[in-house]
C-alpha cells in the first residue's frame, strides 16, 4: 500500500516538521480567494467556498439542510483573516450536514477586515470597504449556525470545563475551541 502524503498547506507539516512554505521543497503556492470566486491559482482552491450565502438559500429552498440532530459548538477566538478563513472553510464543508454551530468572539468592534488595506482606509475612512465579508454574509448562514460577538475580549480558557470567559464575565461553553488571535508586535 502506498504511503499517504499529508495535505499540503503553507507552513510546517505537523508530523515531519518539514517546511512546505514557499520556497519550500514542494513549491506550494499561496492561495487567496476573492469574494467573487474568480481566483483559483491551484487545483486545491475551491471558488465555491466564497458563494456560501447562495448555497444556503438554494439548500433551504430544496429542503436539504439537516437540522434534525444535535450539533457540536465550535468557539473561534479571533475574528481576523485567519479566523474568518477558518469559519468560511468549516461552513463550506458543513453546510449540508449541519454538524457544527459556530460562535466567534472578536476583540475589535468591527467584523473581520483586511488589515493589509488599512492604508486605503485613511484615504476613504469607511471601514466597511475593508470587510472581508459584508455584514449580510454573517446573517445569511443557516439559522443558529453562526453567531459573533464583537468588542469582546476572551480573558480565560477553562479547558477542563470546556468554557471561555470574556471580559464582561460571560462564560461560553464549547465542544471545540479554535484560537485564531493573530499576533501583535
Curated annotation (Swiss-Prot):
The keyword NAD does not apply. Its EC number is 1.7.1.4. FAD binds at residues 72-107. InterPro entries: FAD/NAD-bd_sf, FAD/NAD-binding_dom, NasD-like. Disulfide bonds: none annotated. Residues 14-47 are annotated as: Disordered. It catalyses: NH4(+) + 3 NADP(+) + 2 H2O = nitrite + 3 NADPH + 5 H(+); NH4(+) + 3 NAD(+) + 2 H2O = nitrite + 3 NADH + 5 H(+). It is an enzyme of class 1 (oxidoreductase). PANTHER family: NITRITE REDUCTASE (NADH) LARGE SUBUNIT. This is Nitrite reductase [NAD(P)H]. It comes from Leptosphaeria maculans (Blackleg fungus). The gene is NIIA.
Amino acid at each position: 500500500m502506498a504511503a499517504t502524503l499529508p495535505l499540503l498547506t503553507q507552513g510546517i507539516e505537523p508530523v515531519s516538521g518539514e517546511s512546505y512554505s514557499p520556497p519550500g521543497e514542494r513549491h506550494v503556492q499561496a492561495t487567496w480567494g476573492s469574494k467573487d470566486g474568480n481566483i483559483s491559482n491551484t487545483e486545491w482552491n475551491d471558488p465555491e467556498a466564497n458563494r456560501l450565502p447562495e448555497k444556503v438559500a438554494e439548500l433551504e429552498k430544496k429542503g436539504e439542510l439537516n437540522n434534525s440532530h444535535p450539533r457540536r459548538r465550535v468557539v473561534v477566538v479571533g475574528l481576523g483573516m485567519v479566523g474568518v478563513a477558518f469559519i468560511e472553510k468549516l461552513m463550506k464543508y458543513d453546510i449540508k450536514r449541519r454538524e457544527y454551530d459556530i460562535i466567534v468572539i472578536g476583540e475589535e468592534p468591527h467584523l473581520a477586515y483586511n488589515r493589509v488595506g488599512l492604508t486605503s482606509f485613511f484615504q476613504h475612512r469607511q471601514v466597511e470597504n475593508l470587510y472581508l465579508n459584508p455584514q449580510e454574509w454573517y446573517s445569511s448562514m443557516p439559522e443558529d449556525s453562526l453567531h459573533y460577538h464583537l468588542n469582546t475580549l476572551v480573558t480565560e480558557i477553562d479547558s477542563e470545563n470546556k468554557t471561555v470567559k470574556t471580559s464582561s464575565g460571560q462564560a461560553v461553553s464549547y465542544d471545540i475551541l479554535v484560537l485564531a488571535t493573530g499576533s501583535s508586535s
